[in-house]
Amino acid sequence: MIRNTTKNITVITNMNRILMEFDYSPNIEVISVGGTFNKRLGGTVGAYTVEQIKHFNIDKAFVGAGGVNIEENFLSNFNFDESIVKKEILKNSKKNYIVMDDEKFYKDGAHKFGTLEDVDYIITDKAPDDTVKVELDKYDVKVIY
């Protein structure tokens, strides 16, 4: 688990739950990105959050998705303010990991925040079906399950 790493790493997050996850990890520096706190999401969102993210050089980003439309090639979410934050994170990261349940390959949120070209890996709970694998291969997206 990353929490017990001996490497020195920096975690940048807008989510309170993630902040608390690394509370007692001596080798992990945690940076909290400010903004408008959304109680339902448990994190900060909006224009101020996006502006702060622009100033970071991110090696690896781990971003949740409400849906991945493999036929029309887009990542989506259900909250606009959260989506603009995710879009900026993907733009400023060298490697992008989308974290989601397998069932979200067949769901669409109202707000698009990226495409499969923006994604390097998808981390999911089980192997996707063959139709999904074929589409992901077109964009060189690797799946971890």
Residue spans for each PLM region:
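N-terminal active-site beta-alpha-beta segment that forms phosphate/nucleotide-binding
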Residues: M1-F56
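Local beta-strand N-terminus motif with an aromatic residue
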Residues: I58-D59, V119
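C-terminal functional extensions of proteins
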Residues: G109-Y145
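Short, conserved loop/helix-junction motifs that constitute active-site signature segments
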Residues: I2-T6, I89-K94, F113-D118, L136
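Short secondary-structure boundary segments
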Residues: G34, G64-G66, M100-E103, D125-K126
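Charged helix-capping and loop-helix junction motifs
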Residues: V45-T49, S76-V85
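Short internal beta-strands
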Residues: T10-N16, Y97-M100, D120-K126
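Short, basic, glycine/proline-bearing loop/turn elements
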Residues: I31-N38, V68-F74, N96-I98
